[in-house]
Amino acid sequence: MSDRKRVYGPSVSVPPYFEEPEQPVFTRTRDVDRCRKIYLKLGWATKAVGSSYFESEKIKIACTVSGPRPSKTFAFRSSAKLNCEFRLSPFSTSVRQGHVQTVEEKSYSQMIEAAISPSILLHLYPKSSIDVYIQVIESDGALATLAAAISCASSAIADANIDCIDLVTGSSVLFNPNTDEYWIDPDYVDERARAAKGSVVMGYMASLGHVTQVWERGTCSPSRLSFLTEKCIKNAKDTRLVINHALLLEKSKSEDP
């Protein structure tokens, strides 16, 4: 007697034939020094202390801030504890993400925390914790997404009226160690298709002129690293202008009767 619930395959079958994947087509129309246009919206989450929405072409990131609030631990701290959580939506990349936080997401959380913590006056909030939640709705390149997450998180902290000495903006560059080629604000196609194995991601405070964090990958001479750093700083300054405009716009809305 056959099992009616079991689905049997055909008695005669052939293995499937898989076509060779096509080579990625370069879609970048920007100059190597030009970053993507940015849209920034503050205060979109009414139940959060501070929030920001960052959009740069395909990159879409939402960030909320909770706190400062009393720490859940009983240990005394003379300054606030900053907690950052970076998460990718299941549909944010070409490969579907799981609901459990991956090692890469935890690493990005630590990198964002290290980039924005120098700008926050944590000593003014003892025995407290500040929680920053970063949700990537759509990603377009790991480097540019990380840099955008830094800018989005810092602008959300400013929207929460947390005392800071400056705002941190992120910037990224992709470069070829064997040639003089480089690409500011690289997208997914740039990272995948170009023969480039070097990258620089930076957190920068434009008003003070201080670099909070730099992550460099690949072989690079000191002179070229200095050149790429200057390119990242220029890009970070341009991003800062967008954040300043969004903060002024949100401030004017709150003052209107």
UniProtKB/Swiss-Prot annotation:
Q: Mind listing the UniProt keywords for this protein, alphabetically?
A: Cytoplasm, Exosome, Nucleus, RNA-binding, rRNA processing
Q: Name one GO biological process term.
A: nuclear polyadenylation-dependent rRNA catabolic process
Where in the cell?
Answer: Cytoplasm; Nucleus, Nucleolus
UniProt lists the family membership as follows: Belongs to the RNase PH family.
Q: How does it assemble?
A: Component of the RNA exosome complex. Specifically part of the catalytically inactive RNA exosome core complex (Exo-9) may associate with the catalytic subunits rrp6 and dis3 in cytoplasmic- and nuclear-specific RNA exosome complex forms. Exo-9 is formed by a hexameric base ring of RNase PH domain-containing subunits and a cap ring consisting of csl4, rrp4 and rrp40.
- Its function? Non-catalytic component of the RNA exosome complex which has 3'->5' exoribonuclease activity and participates in a multitude of cellular RNA processing and degradation events. In the nucleus, the RNA exosome complex is involved in proper maturation of stable RNA species such as rRNA, snRNA and snoRNA, in the elimination of RNA processing by-products and non-coding 'pervasive' transcripts, such as antisense RNA species and cryptic unstable transcripts (CUTs), and of mRNAs with processing defects, thereby limiting or excluding their export to the cytoplasm.
Protein name from the UniProt record: Exosome complex component mtr3
User: What gene is behind this protein?
Assistant: mtr3
